[in-house]
Regions:
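Core subunits and conserved enzymes of cellular information-processing
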Residues: 1-147
């Protein structure tokens, strides 16, 4: 078992919308992942994956694009990754049916609303107490309006 607690989701969630750059319908599902998995995007239309890490960034003009050396690209990942970072999600599988994450409301808010409800388990199976002892809804209530 790892000395550092790692967080994942307690269940799966599916979101859909439109890709802001492609204009195409996009659907993604976020699922729990084991400790040390990290955030991994799985392209369902190509059966390949890309890990969200600095080395996979292939562009950041208008949208962040991730791509492994010989895998598919996934773009417009920045709002979803901001959601994971803000809520402390270390490990998740993100299945996406095309090349672009849906834009939803144009921010991370809808991702946060969906993910924070499932942020209940650590990768080791223990209960997640939340950031600084607060659960996600409590921490969010302390944020300034409009943040």
């Amino acid at each position: 078992m790892n000395a550092v607690r790692q967080t994942t989701l307690g269940d799966c969630v599916t979101l859909s919308g439109v890709g802001v750059h492609s204009g195409k319908r996009a659907r993604l599902s976020i699922a729990p992942a084991e400790a040390d998995t990290g955030i991994v995007f799985h392209r369902l239309d190509s059966a390949q994956s890309v890990r969200a890490c600095r080395g996979a960034v292939r562009g950041s003009d208008l949208a962040t694009v991730l791509r492994d050396s010989n895998g598919p690209a996934v773009s417009t990942v920045e709002h979803l990754l901001a959601c994971f970072a803000g809520l402390g999600v270390d490990n998740a599988h993100v299945e996406i049916d095309g090349p672009e994450v849906p834009i939803l409301d144009g921010s991370a808010d809808e991702f946060v609303a969906a993910v924070e409800l499932l942020l209940a388990m650590n990768s080791d199976g223990s209960i997640f107490p939340g950031i600084m002892g607060l659960n996600a809804p409590q921490a969010r209530a302390l944020m300034p309006q409009g943040a």
